[in-house]
């Protein structure tokens, strides 16, 4: 889909039982979730500086500037790495930390394409993306607390208690934070909570 939109995507590295995989290159989303649901040691990494620099240099052979849209700086160190690397490109690479991830990050990419089509330059696009970064919220729920504990998002004691009570946490992502939003006893209840929250957000955002 990225190719059809004229985009260039850096694949996200995953470590599974000590072996590195690249998203959508030698590991499909289906395979990733199969490993995640099984008893495997799964963790994420970030694209190497060499991979990032090689892509930028290749793009600048064809384009005047690059707008790089990484994951939120609060959720991944890949943003800070990109900003440090961009310092050596004299403004030709603009790294937009617009505090988004997943579907909202994709929305930012589409917004950047629209702004480029309207004639805005890379610096202006980057500035606008950062100004509007907090305009969206993601709600998620998880079936297991294992990876929240592993990533340090919750304490081992909280994970043990939540597992014992079979709680399904509803989490919210806005800006740099992954926060607890609510606790549900079933996935059905968790989904209902998320739908209610999204509906309320839409009503508040478009109440005019």
Enumerate the predicted regions with their spans.
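N-terminal glycine-rich anion-binding loop in soluble enzyme alpha/beta folds
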Residues: 1-51
């Amino acid at each position: 889909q990225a190719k059809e939109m004229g985009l260039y995507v850096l694949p996200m590295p995953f470590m599974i039982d000590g072996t590195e995989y690249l998203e959508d290159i030698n590991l499909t989303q289906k395979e990733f979730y199969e490993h995640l649901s099984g008893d495997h040691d799964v963790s994420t990494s970030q694209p190497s500086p060499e991979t990032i620099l090689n892509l930028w240099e290749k793009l600048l052979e064809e384009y005047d500037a690059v707008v790089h849209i990484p994951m939120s700086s609060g959720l991944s160190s890949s943003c800070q790495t990109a900003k440090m690397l961009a310092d050596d490109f004299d403004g030709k690479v603009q790294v937009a930390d617009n505090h988004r991830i997943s579907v909202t990050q994709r929305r930012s990419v589409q917004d950047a394409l629209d702004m480029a089509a309207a004639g805005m330059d890379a610096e202006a696009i980057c500035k606008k993306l950062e100004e509007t970064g907090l305009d969206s919220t993601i709600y998620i729920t998880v079936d297991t607390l294992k990876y929240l504990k592993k990533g340090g998002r919750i304490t081992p004691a909280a994970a043990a208690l939540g597992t014992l009570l079979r709680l399904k946490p509803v989490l919210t992502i806005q800006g740099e934070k992954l926060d607890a939003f609510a606790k549900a006893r079933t996935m059905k209840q968790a989904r209902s909570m998320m739908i209610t929250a999204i509906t309320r957000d839409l009503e508040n955002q478009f109440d005019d």
